[in-house]
């Protein structure tokens, strides 16, 4: 989120919270008497804390370092379009001398469906 979007969101939140405080607990037209009796008054601590916490979280979100474009770019690691030079080389049974030769002698071709 860039600074312009965050500023616009902040402005909208401030306008919405100001309108809700100006209207009071009953809304624009006074609301129902049932709700007015249940909610005998506004909760000033909770109402004052909510916009403040929203502003604080928005400011912290703006100050957080974003992920670098290099993190978002994750090329296909295997197959075509790889950046390594090893992709052009072919593996051979003798290429890995670290592996013992009995391993390659045990590897037999599989014959599926033929008897």
From Swiss-Prot:
It is found in: Secreted. Pfam families: NPFF (PF15085). Keywords: Amidation, Cleavage on pair of basic residues, Neuropeptide, Secreted, Signal. Residues 20-51, 78-102 are annotated as: Disordered. The modification Phenylalanine amide is found at residues 78, 112. Residues 1-22 form the signal peptide. One of its GO terms (molecular function) is G protein-coupled receptor binding. Residues 23-66, 81-94 form a propeptide. GO terms for biological process: excitatory postsynaptic potential; neuropeptide signaling pathway. InterPro entries: NPFF. GO terms for cellular component: axon terminus; dendrite; extracellular space; perikaryon; postsynapse. Belongs to the FARP (FMRFamide related peptide) family. Morphine modulating peptides. Have wide-ranging physiologic effects, including the modulation of morphine-induced analgesia, elevation of arterial blood pressure, and increased somatostatin secretion from the pancreas. The neuropeptide FF potentiates and sensitizes ASIC3 cation channel. This is Pro-FMRFamide-related neuropeptide FF. It comes from Bos taurus (Bovine).
